[in-house]
Amino acid sequence: MTVMLSCLTQQQELLQSLADRVGQPAIQDNLYFCLAGQFTWVEDWYTTAIAGDVLIFDAGEKEQLARVLQQWEQFTGHVILITGLTEEPDPQTFLTQLALGKQQRCGERHFHWIVLVDPTIEEAFRGLQTFLDGKSHWLDLRLGVGDLEQCTDELWQCVWLEPSPLAPEKRQEMLVNLPHWLAEIVDQKQNLELEPISLLQAKLSLLQGLARESRGEMGRKQAQCHYRESLDVWELLGDTEAIIWLSLRLGYLFLLQAYGEKSRGHQLWQQTRNYAQTAIAALENQQWHFTHGETLNLLGEILRGLEDWEQLRQAAENSLIFFYQLSPFAATDTTPERNQEKLWTELELQGLISLAHSYLCEALVEQWKFDEGKEALKRAFETRPKQVEERDYRPCLANLHYLAGRVQLANDQIRESLMTLRQAQTLVSFEDNPRLYLAILVELRECYLQLEDWLAALAIDQEYQAREYRLGQRAFIGPKPLPCWPEQRICRHPLAPEKMLGGGAEARSAVQSKTMVSLTWQDLQKVWEQKPTPVLVLTGEPGVGKTSWLAGEVLQQMSPERVLLVDFTPHWAEKLWVHLGESFSLPSLGQATTPELVSALQALPILDLLLVLDGENGSLPWQKSPSLRQQELAQVLWQWLLTTSPSQGVRLLISVPPTAIADLYEELKGQLGEEHSLPPLQYQTLSPPTLGQAENWLTQAMAQCRHPWPPSLQSQFLGDLAMEGNGEQQPWLHPIDLQLLGTVLEQEQVTKSADYQGKKLDEWLTLAVQTYLAFLPPHLLKKALQLLKSLADGQQALCLKTEYQLLAALYSAPEPAADNPPEFAQEDIQQLQLLLTLLLRGRLIIVISQATLPYYRLSTTHLAHALQGKSAVISTPALINAGRRGSKSNPNLIAPSPGDRQQGNEDLIAELEAGSSAEEQVVAQKLKAAQLQYQKLVAGINLEKQCQFILKQFLVYPLEALLAAVKTGQDLQKLVTPETPLVQYPSLAPWLSLHSILARINECNRCHHEGPVTVLRISPSMENTPPLVLTATTNGIAYLWSFHGELINVLRGHQEAITALDWSADGQYFATASADHTVKLWQRHGEEVATLRGHEDWVRSVHFSPHHQFLVTSGQDNTARIWNFAGEQLTLCQGHADWVRNAEFNCHGQILLTASRDGTARLWDLEGREIGLCQGHTSWVRNAQFSPDGQWIVTCSADGTARLWDLSSQCFAVLKGHQNWVNNALWSPDGQHIITSSSDGTARVWSRHGKCLGTLRGHDHNIHGARFSLDGQKIVTYSTDNTARLWTKEGTLLTILRGHQKEVYDADFSADGRFVFTVSADQTARQWDISQKDTITLTGHSHWVRNAHFNPKGDRLLTVSRDKTARLWTTEGECVAVLADHQGWVREGQFSPDGQWIVTGSADKTAQLWNVLGKKLTVLRGHQDAVLNVRFSPDSQYIVTASKDGTARVWNNTGRELAVLRHYEKNIFAAEFSADGQFIVTASDDNTAGIWEIVGREVGICRGHEGPVYFAQFSADSRYILTASVDNTARIWDFLGRPLLTLAGHQSIVYQARFSPEGNLIATVSADHTARLWDRSGKTVAVLYGHQGLVGTVDWSPDGQMLVTASNDGTARLWDLSGRELLTLEGHGNWVRSAEFSPDGRWVLTSSADGTAKLWPVKTLPQLLSQGGQWLKNYLTHNALVSPADRPGAKVT
């Protein structure tokens, strides 16, 4: 859009009001507008209020009106005629001419205009509105000299004037349109033939340069020409300000051009310096009066680029002198706006002063004047604008932090420097200030190198190279996957801030990225359009560009919110759940059951989401044994992703290496199970680039390179790396070879073929490797090169080696004992793992897993030959598939098996032992030791694989899984000794599997039948007589079992299905009813007594009378009948019009109750007379039962209700709520509650008066029935969803009994309530142990349990609660005392170290002292607010309390106050004694920790945290203090409070930090959901991932080998020192507030906001094996399907 400008500023208000009037109808009519006419600059109201074209002109300009009429045919937009500004012509005459002219030239085409005239004539033209067709055109209006100068001057004022009269966004928008306006102005200037040396010419040249500067390299060169033309004129005219600005601008552009030249004496550098000196001379003449923001920025960038630090220092000092002359004005005038007398607002002036100080600081730092630099930096921070959140000042603040980091680094404050630099990194983005961002990376790299954090240093190196690539500084980025095409890069220099170059939006415009891959987004779309929607599996060799392809081809095609990228690691399921939970309301993983997880996923809306599981950056899920909870979550997510999610708009893309294809298929198959079919897998292989593709890539890369290669060098470079194709396949290159060789050539500035030919290919590649690893110290560099050469030392070009083979090659182990594997030093193992990680991340090597054993090899054949010293090009087609060795999908390419490798080692040993050399004998012994270690490793790997299958198996076959886990545990036991710590086990998987299974298993026995089992009854409890279990099947057979699962008898008397069972009250008889129309009576052990014949159809029920004299039966012949034990029918009850489903006696045996399909229940006497009719149900009555006292009746019906009746057949309550049939209704044993079960998938608990007390939700399908336990406290439900579920009577789910493969027909409790028995259509009856097993729950508190502690002996427990009490417990869970005297909630309590006393602290402002029997001894009064923390001294003689009143107080053990530690004005969160009891450390809300003598004298203050300190602790030797803070860090201090180390890494509040027992490690926990392990140097040893909520507390095991964390995700978790999760302690229903080990390390005690505390066992492998064997004893002894080898007494193999 061309905009003509005018000096008619009086039109501004009119035009603004005009916008308001035109805007609304214009938007509705969708018209097109263009602004032209009397050429005035108007603020951009037309672009926001109107979307189109408008023509505005002054009716007083007659010449202009004539031109408009001549050009009218070219204009098709709105016409706005403005009158009243000058003379007023006759508007009607003009409009008539306008209309006639348009009609003559355009025929019948429509047109439209809006006329604004005086109100007197407005009505006359209101109706003249029609629409125009066609395209709008520009009006070609010729200007005079006066108009041209005025137009140029207005542009000049808007662009040049500082401060600008325009808002920043308006000014930026005007700069974008500047080239279009200038083109027309310059065109008019040429027509008028003005003088070349004039003010107009100077302004136009400057504006033209500014307009072209943002157009890349060519645009900058054009800008240089325009600026020089303008500078020549300004120098003649003598305008100092323009001379300064143009000199700096030219110097800056030459600096950009010169930056690629290494030589500082290059002509471009000299021109840069000349222009800078010109500007400085002009500034000095003007006493720096023209130093404003842009001038100072330009000068600083130029002098920085020239590295002229002395001149930069002088410039900064001169600027400060000038700024401080203005500062009193700025300080007293707080007006935010500018005016003509005021150059800057206060905020802008602060920014300029701070900027000048920062330049001064940088100059001083570069001159190694650190003390002066530190002072300048201090001033820069003091004067910086306080509104740091404003975008304009964030780069300035980032620069200050960068300089502060450099000063700290120079003063050897490495960790402080690291934190400061990280903060600087968060304040600036790479796109906004590339130079500063890269400078920060350089200093960060130096920090990591000094901290010897080589992995972090490598990551910074790689990021730096990638950033330089984006800037066009390099064409190659080291041994990494191929980048996208070069046009994706940001093609500007790091010294070019976006504000200075202008056109930032254009510079950052997203360009479609391209890779050397032919697969496109359209190809993916076609794949996903198939039915059923397939899963896309992306695979290819490491380094071919899968990640680049994902970023370039996939992520750019979809908005970021529609793409979810998750690392495909063992924790992928938890991470995916968290990602989904951030956008949708998903239940917490710590509390939700599996059905709730499934329901939540199925309830998700249409997502339109692409889920990418990227398996390139770590171990894959099946390569590590997850916990059972992770297994369940993964199975839920897989079933959702593969079955349901496609219909919800979710598309799945999985990226894995070729070797993982077969394992991926097995994983998906195993997760879906037999009931679901696996959707099609669409494989897409990204092949290495062909020679032609690489040529295209290199050509484009060189086109933007500062030192491009000639075609001859490009051809030779690609030719040396090319590999011959197979058959018709084209020659190809490995991308890592290309990047590795290209990087070293670029670094060595090789630009000629002759220079390249000076070395062979293998020499170049070896140099490239050495250069890449040059950041390592000499000892590590040497080992890294030895490792690479070891991998190259094999018969094959790409040989595979295990970690232990590399250990044996690089390190020596002490001589092992006989038959024992060698034990390499832990330091050597850690060093090798570090080197492997470094080389893997650098893509110099790759890892291939075979049977979960990792094998390492070099990434490319060229690299292997270079390290071997061979330069021959290998042209074998087998290399294309080198990475697929060991893939089950390609059996022809199998790596040597462990057995083959073992045989090779044995041959080598034998050969060496045959020699006579002592040296050879030593080598042979070492190899033999390595072989033993290798065998042990392989055994551990095999155990890992077995346990992965076992944990999956447990979800379906619990007993078989436990048996298999016991066997793997026995195998592991053979590899270790009783003294071997867990961290040295070759595999922890068997220990983890046993712990996990034994903590969750319920099934303890299984009885197999010959058909579906439909009915179950347990004999009544009898003294000295064990109960028996009676089951029956659909094929007419009944089975009699002992309570331990031993088959006693098989009863084959019925000819058809058995429908009902019952025991007599004395347990001596039982009865079976059948579809064969008969009932049979049997003695206890299965002798048949009588057959009851008389029914004419199926018999549906049978019940004994209470005094076991009679039986009552009911059947489908519409009758009920009473029989004696001789089988004689005594009474016939007739009256029902349909089946009688049930009949039973009341508790006295005098009344009979029947329920029928005719919709009624009836009461009968023993003579068969009907004495009551219960009518009211609208469908058939499925069951009817007397209450235990015989006074009430409950019935349930297919009409969805249950009803309560009295003995007079009056209904007094209708139980409504179910949405389908009510299948069963039963009374609780005490008659106070009723349980109903329904086909709607729920059961409900009701009071005896009909009030619903709770709904039991969770089953997926119809619930057949439900039963109360004998004590009435538990309920079991059984369902067609193949499960039974255990609940409290209040409706809380306790556990799900999984294992049945088909629907569960019946279930019942044992008399003691410890067991549940179930029967199923899967032909089994199962026994489930529902006791709490090893976990002990401490129940009694009525509110949160805030903390729980062991006494020193570990035989007593203390809990404190928000219910204002503390409680003492035994380790069996018995409460022995309630400490109830506080008036507020008890926050903390502790046993004294001698075990004689207890102290509690409360919100009631007191602490109280008790003896260990719970008797209160004294009250510690003195605090003025809540007591937050209490601690005994190590000798039990003193107590320290910490309070919200800002004090800590010291007391003796009689309650006398000894000292007040009064230093703070805010909360003291914690207070701890030193190990010798002589000192105390306190943690406070004022960001400090205090160190005190016990008598109250201050020793030191730990200052440095930037937030409240929540925790403080002495080290075991009392020499150091450890603190944890809200500022996301923990810190270590010396005894006087001087800072030593900062543990920075957490992303949120650090709640607690603890030294390990030996003091060599530190554990921290944080609100960022993680815990971390650190060594004493501050290096992160491990990050503990797994919790789904904040982690609040941590505790070390007494031996320091494990730690336990507690989280608000409802779990506590155990970890080893490598960060591996050992156990998840699940069971609490709310936040776990604390967790600690017992003194012997065998138990963990947790407290929770659910009002309970729990004791969890931590068992050794022998204990677990013993427990597992005991659990399986009955199953292995009596189950007929168990192998004889697994029977007790047989050797388990």
Curated annotation (Swiss-Prot):
UniProt keyword terms in alphabetical order: Repeat, WD repeat
Under Gene3D superfamilies, the record lists:
Tetratricopeptide repeat domain (1.25.40.10), YVTN repeat-like/Quinoprotein amine dehydrogenase (2.130.10.10)
Look up the domain of life of the source. Bacteria
Keyword ATP-binding among record annotations: no
State whether keyword Cell division applies. Answer: no
**Classification via InterPro entries:** G-protein_beta_WD-40_rep, TPR-like_helical_dom_sf, WD40/YVTN_repeat-like_dom_sf, WD40_repeat_CS, WD40_repeat_dom_sf, WD40_rpt
Q: Where are the WD repeats?
A: 1008-1042, 1053-1083, 1094-1124, 1135-1165, 1176-1206, 1217-1247, 1258-1288, 1299-1329, 1340-1370, 1381-1411, 1422-1452, 1463-1493, 1504-1534, 1545-1575, 1586-1616, 1627-1657
Fetch the Pfam families from UniProt: WD40 (PF00400)
Descriptive protein name: Uncharacterized WD repeat-containing protein sll0163
Originating species: Synechocystis sp. (strain ATCC 27184 / PCC 6803 / Kazusa)
